[in-house]
Amino acid sequence: VTFSQGLELTDRSESGVAEQNGTYVEFVVDREVFGDYAYNMEYVEQMVKNYTYLNLGLTVVLNGKPYISKNGLLDLVNDTMSSEPLYAPIHITGEDIEIVITHGNGYGESYYSFVNGQYTPQGGTHQAAFREAIAKTIKEFYRKDYDPSDIRTSIIAAISVRVDDPIFE
């Protein structure tokens, strides 16, 4: 299907395409509508990577470069670490959740959170609950009253949940 200025121009299928599955999308900026718009390719590339982390086996080709993830959010965490973690990342998957957690050598907390395949850079209820659960679990396991911020210092984690009828604020 070809669109221009919001109108459908053609509705056709590609002939001579070797692949029997998948979708080809090409976006060309309409200068009359967008002027001298330029893509922020760093942003687009990160979005493409996120889609592959969240959809195992999905291959996305951006400007001739293929992106694929074989290990989901584990690949995201490994790709974002700048040094060796303190321990091998813990990778947990369930029917509607995927979590990866480790600790690095730095300060602060690094979270990558997603709801229904959408990146939630500001976190959300799922991330807040995860942060609390990590601190509570460690405190209960060791039977110590550690400060939660000490437990979470240098944490690197990714969480993806699937939620029926999510509310984004």
Task: Give names to the regions the model predicted.
Residues 1-82:
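GHKL-type ATPase core
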Residues 42, 49-51, 57-169:
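GHKL/Histidine-kinase-like ATPase module
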